[in-house]
Amino acid sequence: MTKELSFKDSGWADYLYWQTKDKKTLKKINALLKDIDRNPFSGEGKPEPLKYNKQGYWSRRIDGTNRIVYKVTDTQIIIVGCKGHYDD
């Protein structure tokens, strides 16, 4: 079942940044978003559950320095960020 994809303001700002700065990274992000929809907790980008104050969130590697941080609910995949590292 496909879930609705939504973005927090910070996640959308990050996504728009990649649209203007780096098409290759944007293509990788789009591929990861499709994979997250199919398999939220396994697949490409080494999915990893976050801990401590970020429990309930997951991250996937875009590249060596950037991660997608997201949360999955019954009906949505919420993108919190897709630029930098989740500790930034």
Label every PLM stretch briefly.
Residues 1, 37, 46:
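Glycine-rich, flexible loop/turn motifs
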Residues 2-4, 10-26, 31, 44, ...:
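Enriched for short, Lys/Arg-rich terminal
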